Design a protein with these regions (language model features):
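Short, Lys/Arg-enriched N-terminal segments with co-localized hydrophobic residues
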Residues: 3-21
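Active-site proximal loop and beta-alpha junction motif in alpha/beta enzyme cores
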Residues: 19-98, 104-318
Length: 318
């Protein structure tokens, strides 16, 4: 296993870091992995710190910014007796209450580090949004499922503005109103006619300003097209410090609910399909979807495989 070392100096911006401060060092092991992929160098990269004890909120954010992955997750002891561990999730810009690929990746670490007994098939993670249920489906490597938090449907968005913001023609869009749907992170879902339009779409900050007001919470934008196997999609998150995300579990639950609502996929309990994401950016990801609830709106599970990549130690001079 490749092992790396990163040294970061944390100091007050108004004070110089003196040599004597170098005696106060804390070391923190971290793991990197590719989530929603069965092979390395695909899927969505993630860093997980198995023991974040003693790392402050500010330093967690600094670490996430330094690593500059879509998200970095930090594991700590739970405050709830029914949860295996507590998880904090940070993008390079902010902390998230919930995110899909960090939840799947952290669950893989929980299994590998034996935070739960070997052979455990179900457990709960404590996240800021609340308890998140995890289910493990045995395979050559485990297929890990998360129960999507409660989904809410928000405002509709003008198709002309959506097309303009994404660099498309309004005729490229499906005849279904784009809509904000949330399972913790509000996501504007825009359906287009085929994969070519998905790959042509792009979102800059100027385009984002057409889609939301400044007082709204940060918005993800998902562009998708229905496929024989489910969906083909891209997700843009400039407000989260992520221009394009290779795999977005927190947006895939809302996508599934949106597709069921608009009769693009069956809402019958037990329905399974996939969302293929990240292809355009060379990080092909496969997100598995299973519908377990009435009309597919609740009881949605998102599943994926995890490929471990590297292990390292971060030394913080504090």
């Amino acid at each position: 296993m490749y092992r790396s070392f990163i040294l970061i100096a944390i100091a007050d911006s108004n004070e110089s870091l003196e040599l004597k401060d170098m005696n106060n060092i804390s070391s923190h092991r971290y793991l990197t992995m590719d989530v929603f992929s069965e092979r390395v160098f695909e899927g969505n990269p993630l860093a997980v710190f198995p023991d974040a004890t003693g790392i402050s909120d500010i330093t967690m954010q600094q670490i996430a910014t330094e690593l500059n992955l879509a998200e970095t997750a930090f594991i700590a002891p739970p405050t709830r007796p029914d949860c295996a561990v507590s998880v904090r999730i940070f993008t390079p810009k902010r902390e998230l209450s919930f995110a899909g690929h960090p939840t799947i990746g952290t669950s893989f670490v929980v299994l590998e580090e034996e935070f739960v007994p070997r052979g455990t098939s179900e457990f709960i993670l404590e996240e800021k949004i609340g308890p998140v249920r995890i289910r493990v489906e045995p395979d050559i490597r485990p297929l890990i499922w998360l129960a999507t938090p409660s989904i809410t449907f928000g405002r509709l968005c003008d198709p002309d503005l959506c097309a303009k913001a994404l660099g498309l023609n309004v005729s490229d869009l499906l005849e279904i109103s784009p809509q904000v749907v949330s399972a913790g992170n509000p996501t504007l879902i825009v359906g287009v006619r085929d994969k070519e339009q998905v790959d042509q779409s792009w979102l800059e900050n100027a385009g984002l300003s057409l889609l939301k007001s400044e007082d709204e919470p940060p918005l993800l934008v998902m562009v998708f097209t229905p496929t024989r196997d489910g969906a083909y999609s891209r997700v843009f998150g400039p407000e989260h410090g992520v221009r394009e995300d290779p795999a977005t579990g927190s947006a895939t639950g809302p996508l599934a609910a949106f597709m069921v609502k608009n009769e693009l996929v069956s809402g019958a309990a037990g329905t399974r399909f996939i969302s293929e994401q990240g292809v355009k950016m060379g990080r092909r990801s496969i997100l598995h979807v299973q519908l377990n609830g009435e009309k597919g709106v609740n009881g949605i599970e998102i599943g994926g495989y995890v490929s471990p990549v590297a292990e390292g130690t971060m030394k913080l001079y504090v």
